[in-house]
Amino acid sequence: DVFDGLGQLSVSQEFFPNYYLGYGSSYPSLLGAVPFLFEQGSARGMVQDTDNGLKRYDQTILEQFQAAVALLGEAAQQRERLQAFQQRWFADSSDKARANPTKAYAFTSNDQGRFAHFLDLLNAHAIDVRFLESDQTIDGTLYPANRSAVVYLDQARYALIEGIFAVQTPPEDQVVFYDISGWTLPHAFGLKHAALNARQAGRSDAGTAASTAGRSAPILPPAPGDDVLAYVIDWSHFNAPRAVNRILRHELRAKVIPDPVRLETPNGFVDVPRGAVLVPTRRQDMSADDIYALIVRAVEEDGVTVHASLTSRTPSGSDLGGFSVDALEAPKVLLLTGRAGASGVSDNDAGEVWHYLDQMLHIPVTMIDVTNVNSRHLSDHTHIIAVGGAYGALSDGFVDTLKSWIRDGGVFIGTQSGAEWAVAQGLADIDMLGVERVDEEAEAKEDEDEMDPPAPGSYEDKLDYDRQERITGAVFAGVIDPTHPLGFGYDGNEIFVHKEGEKGFEPGDNPFGIVVRYADTPLASGYASATNLERLSGKGMLAAARVGAGSVILFADNPNFRAYWLGTKRLFSNSLFFARAFSSPAPRPEK
């Protein structure tokens, strides 16, 4: 009525479903509130010419104000009904919790950084979480004491807990989504988790309230002395890249150990997983005491585990002075940005990369508009990142220079359509579903002409036809190679990715070029059509190739999605630090 009175055309209950719980129009419904969404087109300045006439900035302010006043007025009139609704809602939530065969959720991770971030999220929503006080084996998976937690469903935040933990299985008649159809948060955080029935929940040894406040940091290693040869940083923790970046920016020498090793420490022998970073205490341009101060920061501020090694010799794994231990350098990152359009970059995708590097890893990022970048910028950087967007503004001359820069040691990282552009330009010998190289497009067009045309359809079904074959945001199960340097820090072979789009990498001649592939049965939560599931089964999500002295690393998806998909961020930081720690296989003789 408000908009009718203003003479403004409006629409309701079209296109925007309330399925995804992250919407402002959905999230309050998990907390006993009645949400309303009012979305308005921007004037993009003072005045914009639209299909409905001129849209003025002052008009948009008036409409927002009138909508807010009308909503508040209606809420005041319906106060008693809203209060009764909220009382019923919480009572119904308690009944639903008791009727649910799932009584609790348990979760754990070898990465206590991601585990801590998830605890903070639950605590921020006033969800009661309890540490497990003894080791538990649930569905064949070990949940270690004090490194695992359990959330019981019978509490005030029942609906929110279910929204966070449950696997999304949309109704069969709902195949069209505005964007996200699956968001199971333990998958997003890369946590092992399990739904517990009444028997399992009753046996779980839950104790003190779980939070990150007051949790003790790992034990400090001994201060340097004549007997401490090097410090070794365990790469398993989410914050390890930040700690290593700080060390590298102090111009210390550091190396990555490619295999699991057994170290001799002042406290005895210690097993350290592959990907650990070695920091020698001697022959550095910094005193041993100053080096130790950085190690103390890594332990106390970043929460990482650091060991003091007494010798280069290891009973198992690479010796610390071995030829397979690769030197690291501080990444100097160039991020392509610019307004989205025919030649522009997704500001969301670029912002997510900036946030991870600048805010979480403390890596400086140079951001240059895609229409202004030139060869001079390349020489000042070790890495260039192209996220989702359009790169038609990059000239053939720049592409040739980029290829030379990569061969000379540069690292190109592409995500989503940034990866598609790299494949099309032939930056590396990597193939992607539905993407043809520029020099092969004519041949591809001939192949398209030979394809069978689709069956005739009714035009009124076109919108659903277009949308149901799109993957707008599901959770896909993946298989990671944790022995590849880009997979260092992961425990086991399972990983979950946010899948948006229908692209994946084809297996090529390099049997080690696919670091992460989609599982044979990839859909873990949300919706993807049977056609897309079959098409993407076993295809690559992360592909990498050495090109001369440099590397090309491509993601079919966005590993930094909305800054909360922590489970795949390690893949991105590995691409920064370990991009030259892998090699191409030797050529095979032709049969």
What are these regions (language model features)?
Residues 1-9, 14-16, 20, 24-591:
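Intrinsic-disorder/low-complexity accessory segments
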